[in-house]
Design a protein with these regions (language model features):
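N-terminal Rossmann NAD(P)H-binding glycine-rich loop of SDR-like oxidoreductase domains
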Residues: 4-19
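Rossmann-fold cofactor-recognition segment
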Residues: 29-45
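Conserved Rossmann-fold cofactor-binding substructure of NAD(P)-dependent oxidoreductases
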Residues: 40-56
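Conserved NAD(P)H cofactor-binding loop of Rossmann-fold oxidoreductase domains
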Residues: 60-69
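Substrate-binding pocket helix/loop in short-chain dehydrogenase/reductase
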Residues: 70-71, 78-80
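Catalytic loop of short-chain dehydrogenase/reductase
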Residues: 82-83, 91-93, 106-132, 136-141, ...
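C-terminal helical subdomain
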Residues: 144-147, 151-162, 166-200
Length: 200
């Protein structure tokens, strides 16, 4: 399969690229690195990416920024960061990318455990991740030509525990390699409209 991986240079993206590149033709995409570059907050950038890459069998996203901060001091501009990046950025990939997928192709997006287990300073993250679950479940009902869509929802990554020190007290972590296997299930499997929870 020809697979485009957005966010390929991140912790999850690197693991997913390693897992999928053994069997497939992978195009690595990042904001500033990779075979191609894209800004998922820009419709023009996303459109240009797909026009350049052409038709693919799978679109994989391991991308999306969020805002972490206390609700008491949060501004709408802070909250908008996660909406524009992880939520609308990935929705944009799906809405645009569907037209570049071959029949029977797939879209795999990423959310996270905070959709179900809120944390302190994580209001934006919980909102965005929960919204992505709703989008994937609904989109699966309407995508044509046998196109599938699923969502990967991992707990905190083992590789990122120190980075998010204090945000996930008592949460068990999971290595990125385990998350990559959930991506394989989505890309190489047959199911659609699912949330693949990893580590919880």
């Amino acid at each position: 399969m020809k697979i485009i991986i957005i966010g390929a240079s991140g912790t999850v993206g690197r693991a997913v690229t390693e897992a999928l590149s053994r069997r497939h033709d992978v195009i690595r995409v990042g904001r500033t690195q990779g075979d191609e570059q894209v800004d998922i907050t820009s419709q023009a950038s996303v459109q240009a990416l797909f026009e350049k890459v052409g038709r693919v069998e799978a679109i994989v996203s391991a991308s999306g920024g969020l805002y972490f901060g206390p609700l008491a001091t949060m501004k709408d501009s802070d909250f908008n960061q996660g909406l524009q990046d992880k939520l609308l950025g990935q929705v944009r990939l799906a809405l645009t990318g569907q037209h570049y997928l071959n029949d029977g192709g797939s879209i795999t997006l990423i959310s996270g455990i905070v959709a179900h287990e809120p944390i302190a300073h994580g209001v934006n993250a919980t909102t965005v991740n929960a919204a992505l679950e709703g989008f994937v479940r609904a989109a699966a009902c309407e995508l044509p030509r046998g196109i599938r869509i699923n969502l990967i929802s991992p707990t905190v990554l083992t590789e990122s525990v120190e980075t998010y020190d204090g945000f996930f007290p008592g949460f068990e972590s999971v290595p990125a390699a385990a998350v990559a296997q959930a991506y394989r299930r989505s890309v190489e499997g047959v199911q659609t409209g699912l949330v693949y929870k990893v580590g919880y």
